Design a protein with these regions (language model features):
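N-terminal active-site beta-alpha-beta segment that forms phosphate/nucleotide-binding
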Residues: 1-10
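Core alpha/beta catalytic barrel or barrel-like domain that forms the active/cofactor pocket
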Residues: 1, 24-34, 123-129
């Protein structure tokens, strides 16, 4: 869904992070084409990127961090990369149809559906500190992602910047 929900925009987003074909040593295939891999019990379709679906194997990589719009055991991270990143625009629209209130609850349910019906092999979780520096890296086999990601998120939240006052009075004069 990033990059303006276009294949070209997604490549530009990756390039902004220094992830290029030259850096990787392989082609970057980007498209907005998806495959419906199944439906949830409530009838909601689950989508994944067509290229990823056809790949021999998938390794997800994502920064695990607090989300700005919702809280839960899964926020921004490997599960969200599977659900919204691999789901492309169609997947993002399906997931967001009930608003952010349900997103924290739905991420692990949809991620499990994806893990069970695609060739996701592993995930690489990246955590940052208060200075936006990578300070934690953990690899997880696909069967470990749902169990390990909440603890990884907790550890990244511990490294965020914070104001070290329990009680503070502030006077602002203009």
């Amino acid at each position: 869904s990033h990059g303006g929900a276009t294949a070209e925009g997604q490549v530009e987003t990756l390039t902004g992070y220094g992830v290029t074909e030259d850096f990787l040593g392989c082609p970057i295939k980007s498209s907005m084409d998806t495959v419906e891999i199944g439906r949830l019990d409530n009838g909601q379709p689950v989508y994944v990127d067509k290229y990823a679906y056809e790949a021999d194997g998938i390794i997800l990589c994502g920064r695990v961090k607090a989300h700005t719009a919702f809280r839960g055991p899964y926020e921004s991270g490997v599960c969200k990369m599977a659900v919204i990143g691999m789901g492309k625009q169609k997947g993002a629209e399906a997931v967001h149809r009930d608003g952010f209130y349900e997103l924290g609850k739905m991420l692990p349910i949809i991620a499990k559906k994806i893990f069970d019906n695609t060739k996701v092999m592993a995930g690489l979780a990246l955590g940052e500190n208060a200075f936006d520096q990578t300070c934690l890296i953990e690899s997880m086999l696909v069967e470990e992602i749902l169990d390990k990601e909440p603890d990884f998120l907790r550890r990244t939240k511990e490294r965020l910047g914070k104001i070290y006052f329990d009680n503070i009075d502030v006077l602002v004069v203009e």
